[in-house]
Design a protein with these regions (language model features):
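Substrate-binding/catalytic cleft of secreted carbohydrate-active enzymes
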Residues: 1-175
Length: 175
């Protein structure tokens, strides 16, 4: 589903330095029960609309909106409605540490633009889900210069699933 909430903290908090934003990112929407019905409605509509499309192999909960009760409920609904497909949500890592979060309905651990060392830390540590890059190698300028490093890492670790290159296009100004 196209649930995206880049920076709602700007509207809610006077102290918007990065540490404060990161620590409280999930409070305004993702971990706010008042948004459960809205998030669930959007997820339901997407899944019901696209359930018969053969190209859909993974349900994504959205992009960069943090994690909390709204997405826990949405994931539970998705799994009850369509258990045949995998689920992922890149923003599941963005929580506030104030409670124990439910990740049981997530099948994949997904990230955007991690370093190779960050990936290795998850895989060699306590990571309990296959690792997938839901966005990497943004093709802007010389951004994709790390493709070979990622490919070698994918090939040498059985619990990686590869990834999805974000925007395989050139954003340079045409002259």
């Amino acid at each position: 589903a196209d649930i995206e909430a880049h920076g709602p903290s700007e509207l809610f908090y006077s102290d918007n330095n990065w540490d404060n934003k990161a620590a409280r990112w999930n409070e305004p929407i993702a971990n706010n029960p008042e948004f459960c019905e809205s998030i669930l409605d959007r997820i339901r509509r997407c899944v019901i609309r696209d359930k018969n499309r053969a190209s859909v192999v993974i349900w994504s909960m959205g992009n960069e909106s943090a994690y909390g009760v709204t997405f826990e409920e949405a994931l539970a609904w998705v799994k009850s409605y369509d258990s045949s497909r995998l689920t992922h949500y890149e923003s599941a890592q963005y929580t506030d540490g104030k409670r124990k979060y439910d990740y049981s309905n997530l099948d994949l651990y997904s990230r955007m633009y991690p370093s190779i060392s960050e990936m290795a830390e998850y895989i060699d540590g306590d990571g309990d889900k296959p690792y997938i890059l839901c966005e990497y190698c943004h093709a802007m300028g010389n951004g994709p210069g790390d493709l070979e490093d990622y490919f070698q890492f994918f090939d040498s670790h059985e619990t990686t699933c590869g990834g999805f290159v974000w925007e395989w296009c050139d954003h340079a100004i045409y002259r």
